[in-house]
C-alpha cells in the first residue's frame, strides 16, 4: 500500500512538564578555599632624565586631489569648443572639473572613387579609480581605430620562426586563383 500525503497530520499530545520557579533565590555556594590575592602590578619606571621629543614628521600632501562626484553624479564642464569648417574638417574638445579631457581633429578623406570618409586623430584622458592617470591617443581612418596608451597590456613577442614566415608570405604573395566556388 502506498502512503498518502496528509497536509494536516495529527499528532499525539506530548506530556511536557516544566518546573515551576522557586520562591527562594538560589545563591552560589562559597568556594571551598580562598586563593591568595594576586600580587600588586609592577610600578612604572620613571626615567631620571626627560625623554627627547620625537622628530616632527613631514606632512603628506597629495600631488593632486581628485574631486568627488557631485550629489547628482554630474560634473561641470570647464572648457568646451567645437569648430566645423566648410571643407569638412573639424575640431572639438572638452575638459571637466574632475580632470576628464578629450580632443579630436578630423577631416574628410577620399577612401574610394566617389566615396569620402573621415580621418580623425585625438586623445582622451582621465584618472582611474586607483589614481592612475590614463591617456589614450588614437587615429581613426580607413585602417580602423588604432589606440595607444601606456596602460594597455603588452603581449608576448612574436617568435622568430613566425616572424620569418610572415616576412616570407609578404615577400611572396600568391596570385589569387579563381575556383568554381569564387565565381559569382
Swiss-Prot record:
Glycosylation sites: 24, 29, 33
Modified residues (Pyrrolidone carboxylic acid): 1
Residue ranges with Pro residues bias: 27-59
S-S bonds: none
GO cellular component: chitin-based extracellular matrix
Source species, domain of life: Eukaryota
Chain residue ranges for the region called Disordered: 1-66
Domain Chitin-binding type R&R: 87-156
InterPro entries noted in UniProt: CHIT_BIND_RR_consensus (IPR031311), Cuticle_Struct_Prot (IPR050468), Insect_cuticle (IPR000618)
Keyword terms: Cuticle, Glycoprotein, Pyrrolidone carboxylic acid
Short name of one Pfam family: Chitin_bind_4
One term of GO molecular function: structural constituent of chitin-based larval cuticle
Task of the protein: Component of the abdominal endocuticle.
Protein name: Endocuticle structural glycoprotein SgAbd-1
Native organism: Schistocerca gregaria
